[in-house]
Amino acid sequence: MSENHDAIVTDAKTEEAGGCPVAHGRAPHPTQGGGNRQWWPERLNLKILAKNPAVANPLGDGFDYAEAFGSLDLPAVKRDIAEVLTTSQDWWPADFGHYGPLMIRMAWHSAGTYRISDGRGGAGAGQQRFAPLNSWPDNGNLDKARRLLWPVKKKYGQSLSWADLLILTGNVALEQMGFETFGFAGGRADVWEAEEDVYWGPETTWLDDRRYSGDRELENPLGAVQMGLIYVNPEGPNGNPDPIAAARDIRETFGRMAMNDEETVALIAGGHTFGKTHGAGPADHVGDDPEAASMEEQGLGWRNSFGTGKGGDAITSGLEVTWTSTPTRWSNGFFKNLFEFEYELEQSPAGANQWVAKDAPEIVPDAHDPSKKHRPKMLTTDLSLRYDPIYEPISRRFYENPEEFADAFARAWYKLTHRDMGPKSLYLGPEVPEETLLWQDPLPEADGEPVDAEDVATLKTKLLESGLSVSQLVSTAWASASTFRGSDKRGGANGARIRLEPQRGWEVNEPDELAQVLRVLEGIQQEFNSGTKKVSLADLIVLGGTAAVEKAAKEAGFQVQVPFTAGRVDATEEHTDAESFEALEPVADGFRNYLGKGNRLPAEYLLLDRANLLTLSAPEMTVLVGGLRVLGANYQKSPLGAFTRTPGSLTNDFFVNLLDLGVTWKSTSEDQTTFEGRDAATGEVKWAGSRADLVFGSNSELRALAEVYASDDAKEKFVHDFVDAWVKVMNLDRFDLV
């Protein structure tokens, strides 16, 4: 516990015996956290399915950020930001008289938490303002950068989100220092609470690294080497100043952010063209991070007792390195100094490992004393760009071709800062580049006259008469649409990339079965498209699921019309980055009762994680699982969770039979992943289930939802709720409908 909590809080929590109240057996008040999670730390956290609720948004349901952003005079905003950058404040003086390098670091660290494996992190919601990111060691003193920007945020209010402002400021900083950026897109709407659904690692101590196993194998989905770092330790692995070993960490962590070797070199060299690091004194002079700091600090942290605590006495990383002789101007100086000098190891004033140019002139300016000069210095991770056999030729080519380097950095910076925004159609503002890039998962424009209601009815009939079963149609539509990730707005049914590699070969999609279904659907498409109108395979896949759900509802005794909106298009192989899409392959899909190999978490947690990526609520997750089970959507037609005698009929049987008091459940596997339900009276085996099934009876909150759908009066409600949740998933990537 922090030693700097306010006295009034400390008094309220501390027992007469003194010390930490938790250590002395006292549970925290609900306002302090804890609660049920303290008693049962491994219980499912369903709150991640109710994040950013409307009641927490002070702007109200009617606020349209895209419209508000569109009202901005963006050049005027940029002029105001530029004025901040060049107006040094006594309370936090600007290095070299310019806040540009600080703001580049702020923007980079806002975006740099993105990881491609689950799409989480990134700049899209301005999470750098909240814990834990606001207090990560690697984000030291970025609280000051954001505070410097408050006058700009205050002036433009809700028309400019913090999330957009952080990235825009990074761009303005680059432009003010002579660099031509690739472009900027707004559209990052703020949220109002810290993310609780991101796994940042197993460690409970800053800068610990329990995330490795075997031959330095980094745990998935993590994208940094230590808790509280954005990427790598700049001193080298665990502080070991070995540039070759550091290069391995760089390649791993930047790769997990979807950056290749050229982009990695460009980003590191481009970013380190500007500014300096800060390590004027020992780390024990630095106080608590912003989240732990006392109330009078008003959200600022890392108060420094060394000297003046700022300017030339600042302490952030503990390293004291300035890379170039022009730290506030774009140049090729980083590569010049990297290749033209030899470096020897030294320790910073804080005791950190860094490198200084041997026998070099003092050509680097001091950040705050114009009478001083210094020799060029480098980080261990900078030297990786010279000594790693893959990075070195890239670095040398960039050194010899400055224009190529500038273009590579501009593009890599744009990718870094826009990677989690979703398709280009969501980009806002006058500075959005015309060029569409492969990492944006581009889709073609719709071709031909769209289908109408009569066409849809005709196609439904053809689909249901095609010989494909309800199970096949539902499973294919689900497989296509459920790739969507709300974290970075990738995936989904639009584009029909399920017919392309790598998706058509994913184990969870049962490639042989999928190929059979796609052949039938493509035949229907070709026949229809021989006329004057066109239907995309993407639309046809979803329509097949739609027709199947309607048929299944009718079998259950309910006539429903499942909403369907045409307009999807088919992506091309040329515009599909297969390697990038490999990250979307599910390691588990509890909705299909699929559990891949090597998962660390039990199936019920993975189901919850999948539901979270699909932006589902707990009721939506519940009703979808119950419906998909009776519709036969299980992986390889597994009997697990198929608690019905009428498969293909959209009944609430899953819930009725799961909650049947006449059934007792026993594990059938040593790892307790599968179970059988026996008739309590006869001992006859009635059902088989997985953890992703039985959790709806064992977890008290999910059981409460299951009871709703198992009730005698819930049959029709179940059908309508399933349809609503189904349509939501089918349309998750239909940003054109919002």
Curated annotation (Swiss-Prot):
Keywords of the record: Heme, Hydrogen peroxide, Iron, Metal-binding, Oxidoreductase, Peroxidase
Region of interest called Disordered, as start-end residue ranges on this chain: 1-37
Cofactor note: Binds 1 heme b (iron(II)-protoporphyrin IX) group per dimer.
Tryptophyl-tyrosyl-methioninium (Trp-Tyr) (with M-257) crosslink residues: W108-Y231
UniProt protein name: Catalase-peroxidase
Site (Transition state stabilizer): R105
Residues annotated to bind heme b: H272
Pfam families per UniProt: peroxidase
Gene: katG
Subunit (UniProt): Homodimer or homotetramer.
Catalytic site: H109
UniProt crosslink position (Tryptophyl-tyrosyl-methioninium (Tyr-Met) (with W-108)): Y231-M257
HAMAP family listed in its UniProt record: Catal_peroxid
UniProt enzyme class: oxidoreductase
NCBIfam families linked to this entry: cat_per_HPI, PRK15061.1
Bias type Basic and acidic residues, positions: 1-16
The keyword Ion transport appears for this protein: no
GO biological process, one term: cellular response to hydrogen peroxide
UniProt record similarity statement: Belongs to the peroxidase family. Peroxidase/catalase subfamily.
Cofactor(s) the record lists: heme b
